[in-house]
Structure formats: C-alpha cells, structure tokens
Amino acid sequence: MDRRNFLRTASSFALLAAGATTGVSRVFAKTPSFSLTGNQSDENTPNMGDTMEYRKLGGLDVSAIGLGCLPMVGYYGGKYDKKDMIALIRRAYDKGVTFFDTAEVYGPYTSEEWVGEALAPFRDKVKIGTKFGFGVEEKQPTAINSRPDHIRRAVEGSLKRLRTDHIDLLYQHRVDPKVPMEDVAGTVKDLMQEGKVLHWGLSEASARSIRRAHTVCPLSAVQSEYAIWWREPETKIFPMLEEFGIGFVPYCPLGRAFLTGVIDENSRFYEGDRRWNLPQFTPEALKHNMP
C-alpha cells in the first residue's frame, strides 16, 4: 500500500465520540440536538444500508466509523441519563456501527457498564475496545499504572462490566514509564492465550514503544489523536504502522467538535467541560481559528 492510500485508509477509522461528537458534546453558543427514537432491529442485526463501510483492523472486522463512549459520562460537561445513552449506543448499532470504544477510567467504570448493557443483546455482532493503564482501583484515576497484576485485575473488571467473556481489542491507555513495555506486552500475551483478550493495541504511544511492544506480542492497532488540525502521527507513527501492518484508530477526528461547525468564536463551554483547559478552545484561539 502506498503512503497516500495508507493515510486515506487510516483516516477513515473515526471514533466519533472519543473526542466529542456533535450529538453528545455541549456548548453554550450552539448546542446541537439529537434523536433517540430509532427502532432496534427485531433480528438484532445492524442496518448496513448504503452509507456504512467496513474494514479489517488487524484480525477484526469493524465498521469504518466507531462510537467512542467517553463523552457519555460527562467528560465534556453535562450529565446524561443512562437510558438515553443506552438508546444512543443501540441507535448507532442500528445505523451500522459495530465498533465501540470505552475504558475502565471513563466514569470511572460507568461507560463500560453502559456499553455492556447496551450491547448485550447483540454482543456477538459487535467489537468492543477497552483500555487499562490508570490507577482506578487505587482511587487515583490520573495516575498511570500498568503493573502486570494491575493489568489482570483491570481486565477481570472490564469483562464483568462489559458482560462478556472476552475483550475484542485491549489497549494500554497510556505508556507507563515505570513498567518495561516487555512486561506489559508479556502480560497481555498471557491474557490472549487464556482467551480473555483477542487483540491488543497501544494508545498515544511513541514509535519506540510500539516497536518494543510489537516484538513481544504483535499489535493489531494503535490509537492516537488525529485530525485536520493535529497530524503529528504522520511523521513517525504512520511509517512504523505501515512497516508492521498495524491498524490505526484515530480519536478526536472532529477536533472535539471544532471541525463540525457547531462551535464558533462566541462559544463558551459548560462547567466541567475538559475543553476549557485546552489552548485550542480559549476565546482568543477560537477567534483566531475561525474560517
């Protein structure tokens, strides 16, 4: 595959809500609306239609557009009703989405619980990606922790919350500088041999970390932020993924809703919205970056 086709293919994996979809994110100036009135298929089969494309991600068959389930637990401000979010997840499935992204730290735990409940009726028809790597069980959700014993406990917890006997795609959420990557990869390899994990990947990892991990246990995917306004993965990450045949899953492909047109220079975010802390979303930056 040449570089142009690789970039085109890679960029089509869009975890929409992982960086704030227009349907879930909240801004003062222009708050989009969404409908949750879709009817679920009686056959528990997604509506493939003519609009959804499907891809190979390592050995996984996934929809080209996935649903990231971080904003549902208020990461971008606001509080959302469990019933509505389960309906949203199932509506995405009705529209052909078969790839869902979550993590133990989202909530913490809440996102996995909602995803597990929402997808239970058609679990065998979807692929779920989740993540380990933060000190959630120690009540330190911002502390990085990828010790082997912690990984095992995190996976057992995720399996329970997701109501499943296996995780389709398990990511290390962030690289732990205190734990050798070889130890992390070796632990996940053991979990794969036990059938609890089918594929694994890294999130926001350097090229060096990717190489070290892949040497011990081949990676299926790497997840990083990637959008028109953030193309850093093109420099070192994409060439390595192409070399090793590893898939790429971008998060925030819509620039945390900035690229959707629902945000303008007058937008101000709700209290609790994490975008307040990002330099791209200061009033000065919004004004400067408007087309």
Residue ranges and their predicted role:
Residues D2-K127:
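N-terminal binding-site loop/beta-alpha segment at the start of enzyme catalytic domains
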Residues R4-N5, V175, V179-P291:
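Beta/alpha (TIM)-barrel catalytic core signal, keyed to glycine-rich beta->alpha loops juxtaposed to Asp/Glu
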Residues L57, L67, M85, F100, ...:
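Conserved, mostly hydrophobic/aromatic
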Residues V62-I65, G96-T98, R123-V126, T164-D168, ...:
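Short, well-ordered coil/turn segments that N-cap beta-strands
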Residues V73-Y76, G135-P141:
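A short acidic, helix-capping loop that chelates divalent metal ions and anchors anionic groups
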Residues K79-A92, R147-K160, R208:
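Short, acidic/polar
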Residues Y80-D84, T110, W114, T142-H150, ...:
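Alpha-helix N-cap and loop-to-helix initiation/capping positions
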Residues K160-P177:
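Active-site groove signature of glycoside hydrolases
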